[in-house]
Amino acid sequence: MVTKEQLKEKLKLYVILDRKLGNGVPLRQQAQLAIAGGATAIQLRDKEMKGRDYYQAALVIKDVCKENNVLFIVNDRLDVALAAEADGVHLGQEDLPLHAAKKLAPPGFIIGISAVNVEQAKLAEKGGADYLGVGDVFGTASKPDAKLTGVDMLKMICQSTSLPCVAIGGINVNNAKIVLDAGAIGIAVISAVVSQKDITGAAKALRELIP
């Protein structure tokens, strides 16, 4: 079971794997290369993968993360996260409600919640979430239709909660410092790492920006 301070350390560079944005690099290799560059957390995210395939992929990524003492989070699917013995799950506002997930989750299981405003952040904290994913901050290729949260709202959310806030959405080496200065304890990225030719180098460049 990780403490809140340990969790903050584990959430500093949160890399989300993506089959489509990974330029043909297998998910396992994406994880290995990102971790080699300093990723502290890995999330498996796939909106199209069937349950069985998602579970099999989760087992593979869990082993990579366990070998490297890196946090492993499954996106959306609590059933897959629990079956694969992941460290936790990340739930969006339209996914399984937090209170329902808490009933099923074992002690020490990490639950992250997406938040785009202060109200959502406060509800997540009250409901027992462990961290917040805040964004879409700058706009991103993985969610082209997402409404932008912006840096000002990110700052308001970070100030409104004691939960660790991880900024997400269009974050790269050029703007990472902006979200960290706004109060985020870490950054979550997809294309800024897994879409790059040098995944390890891209992760390393970002990790060096995070205190």
Swiss-Prot record:
Gene Ontology cellular-component terms listed: cytoplasm
Binding site for Mg(2+): D76, D95
Gene Ontology terms: biological process: thiamine biosynthetic process; thiamine diphosphate biosynthetic process
Top EC class for this record: transferase
Superkingdom classification of source: Bacteria
Keywords associated with the record: Magnesium, Metal-binding, Thiamine biosynthesis, Transferase
Similarity comment text for this entry: Belongs to the thiamine-phosphate synthase family.
Its job: Condenses 4-methyl-5-(beta-hydroxyethyl)thiazole monophosphate (THZ-P) and 2-methyl-4-amino-5-hydroxymethyl pyrimidine pyrophosphate (HMP-PP) to form thiamine monophosphate (TMP).
Record's protein name: Thiamine-phosphate synthase
Gene that encodes it: thiE
